[in-house]
Regions:
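Short helix-capping segments at alpha-helix termini
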Residues: 85-86, 198-203, 268-271, 303
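Catalytic-face loop-and-helix region of soluble metabolic enzyme cores
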Residues: 202-272
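Charged, elongated alpha-helical/coil segments that serve as electrostatic interaction surfaces
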Residues: 170, 261-269, 278, 294
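Generic beta-strand/beta-sheet core signal
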Residues: 55, 180-181, 210, 279
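Conserved anion-binding
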Residues: 118-155, 159-176, 180, 188, ...
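Active-site beta->alpha loop and helix N-cap motifs at the rims of alpha/beta catalytic domains
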Residues: 2-162, 243-257, 273-275, 281-304
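Generic structural signal for well-ordered alpha-helical scaffold segments
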Residues: 41, 197, 261-265
């Protein structure tokens, strides 16, 4: 059983916004926020996005299809965009492995006081081994900072080998929510069914769905982001991403909506509080938001 009472679930629709490159500065950050408002209005979902989810970006291996340049700090980005997005709160990911305990505590204090309702702790990039990095392990952070951060998140990758045990341990350590990797199959349904049968933890699940524009056919960023060489389940997801990228807009919407329905219908009765995390990996656009609008029309957190 969970030793502590769960915080109230976020029950939210969160939109991922990646901080701009440092060299693009404040104006680009402001334009990102204004684009969210404009695309929300055009797609008819004004007021439906309750949080922005800002990832703490770290340099990964050199195979990344789009070069990783230094990004604006999460906190700096949030302070620029928050006044432009009234009523919207923050979620973020925080890399823990390169900060010692006092430095991480200071960072989390600043994030919490700035309006971040949930912080997901993430580890080293995949070019490094778990345990590398001189700082705090993400699983330790889940318990160390339970008095400081109410909603403490962990990344959940349902197709990853050994993920049942890994996610159970994260919940035991104090994770109150799991944020999934981008979902391009309904593997999360069987994962959560098995998880619910095996233990009594019922963390909130942020189900992540990403729009796939035509550009993916040429660039392959999403294909790279979800990669897990030798994993047939992920290979099938990568094929679905290719299909989405090559599809006409109406077909693309239909395919993504069908996936969304299968996931929502499959996990809705398992007893997990649910939130939705939406991502336009190549940038905010009206076609992405029109797709998100159809998904949210089918089911939205907090809707009767």
């Amino acid at each position: 059983m969970q030793s502590k009472e769960q915080p109230l679930p976020l029950n939210t629709v969160a939109l991922e916004l990646v901080p701009p490159n440092v060299d693009r500065g404040r104006e680009h950050a402001l334009e990102d926020a204004r684009k969210v408002l404009r695309c929300s209005a055009e797609a008819g979902i004004e007021g439906r996005i309750n949080h922005v989810m800002i990832p703490g970006m770290i340099e990964e291996d050199s195979g990344r299809p789009i070069e990783m340049k230094p990004k604006m700090d999460v906190l700096d980005f949030w302070r620029i965009i928050a006044p432009e997005l009234p009523g919207v709160r923050g979620l973020c990911t925080q890399v823990t492995a390169f900060l010692d305990e006092p430095a991480l505590r200071q960072r989390l204090t600043e994030l919490s006081s700035a309006g971040f309702d949930g912080i997901a702790f993430v580890g080293v990039p995949r070019t490094m081994n778990d345990g590398e990095g001189s700082g705090v392990a993400p699983t330790d952070a889940l318990s160390l900072y339970d008095g400081l951060v109410d909603n403490r998140g962990a990344i959940l990758i349902p197709t990853r080998d050994g993920e049942q045990g890994r996610f159970t341990f994260k919940c035991k350590q104090g994770a109150t929510y799991g944020m999934t990797q981008l979902l391009y199959s309904d593997a999360i349904v069987d994962f959560l069914k098995e998880f619910a049968t095996a233990n009594e933890y019922r963390p909130e699940i942020l189900l992540s769905f990403g729009f796939v524009p035509k550009m993916e056919s040429r660039v392959g960023l999403i294909h790279w982001l979800i990669q897990d060489p030798g994993n047939p389940a992920v290979a099938a997801e990568q094929e679905f991403v290719k299909t989405l990228a090559a599809s006409e807009p109406a077909d693309k919407r239909r395919l993504l909506l069908d996936l969304y329905k299968r996931v929502i219908d499959g996990v809705g009765e398992l007893g997990f509080p649910l939130s939705i995390h939406l991502e336009a990996t190549y940038g905010v656009s009206t076609p992405a938001f029109e797709t998100f609008a159809e998904m949210l029309d089918y089911w939205s957190p907090g809707a009767p």
